[in-house]
Amino acid sequence: MKLIICLLALFFSNLSSAKEWVFDAILNDEIVGQHSFIYEDDKTISKANFKFEFLLMDFLYQHNSVETWDKNCLKSISSETDDDGDLYQVTGQVVADGFLVTSNQESTLLPQCIMTFAYGNPEILNQKKLMNSQNGEFLDVEVKLLGEENFILRGEKILTDLWQISAESNNGDMLIHLWYDKDMQWVGLKTSTPIGDMYYQLR
């Protein structure tokens, strides 16, 4: 079984100084790995490493990516992903007439100003299309504000806004829930996978 978890390729963006966040990835109430983000001015470096067992079989997910940004527009991307043996390599950069993205040696010209699923930048909530950094798919998305919700962050209860992003991809439907605090800082995520819900929890 191949488990495509599109959220693993997603980033914060547009932070003005070097910072680091580390999330635990929780699947069926068990920590299965970590996803770290390092932010240096207009650059985001993302690393994920997950390993879990299902039906007595081991599954592995590894992802490394570097994105650069000009405000809310992606300037370049370079990512490599091993989704339990399915390998993806994505590169892309702004060119004269758009954003040229190449995924596993197949190139596509996209609009010049695009965004990935950069959850740390709430501007994604205003988009109609987003690019999946894992495989380069440029997806139609539907974004909804579901309402306010209490959220436990590092042991403390805070009031958040809960958003939903849905999309259809070549690998099936995507349904992602995002929690933002009242300063619009991203604090949590949930997405459905074939074997259960996965959560991102800040360490």
Model-derived segments and their meaning:
Residues 1-4:
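Positively charged n-region of N-terminal signal peptides that target proteins for export
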Residues 18-95, 119-203:
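Acidic, serine/threonine-rich low-complexity disordered tracts
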Residues 13-15:
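N-terminal signal peptide c-region/cleavage motif recognized by signal peptidases
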Residues 97-115:
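Acidic/charged, solvent-exposed loop-and-adjacent secondary-structure segments enriched in E/D, K/R, S/T
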